[in-house]
């Protein structure tokens, strides 16, 4: 990695996301590819009212997230320290695709299958016309 990403505490995340203006700064458009939160000591869900416009990653020793456990349910991804670097590298390589995927999955949770497929098709079509996709395709 070029530089170690900042790892936020749950309290810092809440402070960021309580301000719509500050929350907006956490997006690919502002050069923020993801937010990493040290979630080792979380005991209850954060119940975030809004999510950032970039992937929200929980750093947790047990990355085998159990869907029955809702403590980490606000996060897009749960990784251990060993898994963090490859995940960050993937996000940095394709930040728009990573952000699009997170938004698609967040949005699709409460949709019908038909609505979710429409949203997925729109996202996929837009990504296929992106510079990032063309660059990736050229390396294949």
Listing of model-derived features with the role each one plays in the protein:
Residues 1-140:
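C-terminal alpha-helix plus adjacent terminal tail
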């Amino acid at each position: 990695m070029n530089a170690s990403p900042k790892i936020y505490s749950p309290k810092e995340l809440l402070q960021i996301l309580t301000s719509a203006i500050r929350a907006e700064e956490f997006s690919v458009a502002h050069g923020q590819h993801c937010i990493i939160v040290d979630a080792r000591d979380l005991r209850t869900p954060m119940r975030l009212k809004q999510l950032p416009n970039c992937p929200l990653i929980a750093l947790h020793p047990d990355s085998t997230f159990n869907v029955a456990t809702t403590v980490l349910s606000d996060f897009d991804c749960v990784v251990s320290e060993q898994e963090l670097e490859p995940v960050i590298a993937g996000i940095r390589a394709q930040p728009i695709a990573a952000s699009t995927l997170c938004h698609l999955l967040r949005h699709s949770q409460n949709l019908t299958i038909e609505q979710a497929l429409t949203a997925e098709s729109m996202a996929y079509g837009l990504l296929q016309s992106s510079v990032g996709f063309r660059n990736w395709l050229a390396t294949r």
